[in-house]
Amino acid sequence: MALTGKSSSAQGAQTSASAGGRDLLWTGVVASALAASFAMALYFRMYRVFYWGWWIDEFDPYIRYYLALYTLQHGISWWFKGAYFPDFWYPWGVDWARVLIPGVSLYGLSVYFLLRPFGFDLWHAVVVAPALYNALAVFTMYYFVSRFSDKKAAVLAALLTAIAPTYLQRGFGGWFDDEALTLFLAPLGLGLLIEALKKRPVLYGVLGTTAIGFVAWTWGAQFYIWNLVGLSALVLVAYAVLRAAQGTSPGFSTRNLAISYTIFYFLFAAFESAVLRYGPHMLRSIYNFIPTLGLLAVVGYYLLEARVGLARSYRFLKRFAWVIAAAVVLVAASIPVLAYFHVISGKFLATILPFGRSAIVQSVAEHTYSTFQLELGSYGPVIPFIIASIPSLASPYALPLLTYLVTGSYTAVTQVRLLILVAPAAVAAAAVGMAQLLKIRRFGWAVALMAIASLALFTALGWGTATSPQQIVVSATAGPSVPSADWLDALMWMATRLPPNASVAEWWDYGYWVTILGHRPSLADNSTINSTQIGTIGLAFMSPVETGINIFSKDLKTHYIAAFMPWSALCAYPGYSQFGLWSSQIVQLGNATGWFALPFCTLVPEIPAGGDFLKSYWMAQIANQVYGTDVAKFGLPASYAQHLANPFGYFFTGTSQIGPYFVVGNQFLIVPLNLTTLLYTMLFNMERVYWMWTTYSPYGYPTWIFAGVPAANILTGNETYVPWDVYYAYAKIPPQNQVILGSLCTVSSAGFCYPIAGLNATGFAATSLPPNLRLVYVSKPYGWVVVYQIT
């Protein structure tokens, strides 16, 4: 007996030691996997900095840098008192503390103080900041998933976080904005709140709310996170009621839920109230409706359960089921009413009701609807695993993730930018699904191969995003982006050549660049806080020349106007000559006395895309939405509103609409139909391209592709443009090489030509500048940015 007892004890000790060894080994594997994931994540996020340079990316991050610098110089207190910045939204100025929130500035400064001993200044620190915090998200995602799933799923979540395209898109070095920090904090806060359901609800409730509370100081999408926590509380209460109906425990402590959620409700309210942008009045807004319902539900259910027990609680709630159902219907029905009275508006309304979008909201690329192609590029390789995870998310601790996944997927469809918001839920669900499928031995190898293939494809998608250059490097071009120093050259010129207090009018996309890099007051920027001023700028650009000049000089009090339009010269590509798209030869136009087509170089607007010509559609739409028939107060006829609303008055927008067409090969070009507006006069007059003659002079006269081919009469000296079909006939271009179909020109040719209003019929100037508008700057190297002075 004693011998047997000793033997059993020895075996137990050996088993315990073996288990301890396995645990230690597994801990080492997990630690190594997390370290490798973090290293890979940081490398991916900093690669574009190493390759393209230490640039702050896009537009919004520049104001974040500017305000971080201001905070470093003046302290944090101005965020809670306000400060006036006269160089933005000239001539009115703006108080940024009431428009933006301090979180981004603060996390940038945290990295600055960390790296300052190593010689980093603030600029370089804020370039590193988003990459560092976003890479650290591999640890918070591991923690989040480990709260409701096993460690294998948590490690997979960390790995997916390192390479996920949606994490990378707004987590690169230089993308100093709100998303990078939110993707780090949101899973941390949610994980801590889930932990609060299990133990120590006060401690974990405070920690979780602090993490999510800082999101309220960082990103406007905090309204979603705020309501997500409230909705998750409601879902957990509903789950508890269903379990009570079955006579079983809910599987979590309703006491812990009541305590932790009450802490969340009031502590988050403190974060929300502290900043000037929101303030205490936000707690009385519609955005606090679901969180307040959550508070009533969790506290009410806990008190009911504590007093009368599970079974009687269920019977009591069953009596009032119709009241609860009616409340849900009432909330849904109230949304359009609240939208009508502007209680919910702007991009927040566009998220809830995608069809309730103003022209300004629609004009922002990241507020457009998501597409199937974009969603595949973001999550395609892991969608099967996300679907496979859903049965595993029915446990109480995973219900917040399921709620996040369902609601986040809806918001991601309504706006492209919100594909990023759902990233933690999508990555966590994919990791859980992958781990669950790998447990099925029958499909083990097949699932493993599928997982490896998905990870490889995910990595390829992420790497493609990681290698793309910053917006300032490609001068804000797209489709495809082309590296160019045009905007950098233009901003340096503004900073050094314009009078010190000269304001510059521009479309709102470039306002931050003009003020922060160009050091000159701008009239509008990406904050889009003054729709009337944006509408006025749009109206000035899309009005007849003299009216537009008067609006800029008298109403907006500026005398410098910047415009941006990328364009390509086809004579730079020898292969296009065979298609008649450029020629260094003189071509006699048949037997017409003295008429010859001259050597020419064809210019194509908006290739690469991204300029003001494309955006002019939205300039007109916003101007019409802001003013309508009130354009009459600017000296325009009231009927001009109809002209603004109808793109065929000035702009050919697409192939599905009835109207003129212009096709090169199989590519439809967007072309102007009216050169009499101020913007089109600025963009398409030939003075802006004369500088290129030193490069392209062997090819003859530059000509916009929609104008036709320049021709002159050697006897009379008359000049004109001839339609492309006329040129093809006399230049003997083979039919298979006649790639231009349709034509816009000065002289209508039945069935082929569509006349352009304002196109010069007796010269090669296309359109001429008025005497009170002077071209003072053309950017290098491509001439994409121009600045005019109103004299």
Give the role of each language-model region.
Residues 1-50, 59, 155, 298-329, ...:
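Start-transfer (signal-anchor) and selected internal transmembrane alpha helices
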Residues 2-17, 35-38, 56, 61, ...:
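Extracytoplasmic
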Residues 21-61, 66-67, 73-80, 89, ...:
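Transmembrane signal-anchor helices characteristic of membrane glycosylation enzymes that use polyprenol
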Residues 37-41, 84-87, 128-147, 152-239, ...:
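Membrane-embedded helix bundles of polyisoprenyl
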Residues 63, 67-71, 85-119, 215:
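Short hydrophobic/aromatic helix or loop-helix immediately within or flanking a transmembrane segment
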Residues 92-106, 115-139, 172-176, 180:
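Loop-to-helix entry region of an early transmembrane alpha helix in multi-pass inner-membrane enzymes
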Residues 287-304, 321-401:
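Alpha-helical transmembrane segments at the extracellular/periplasmic loop-to-helix junctions
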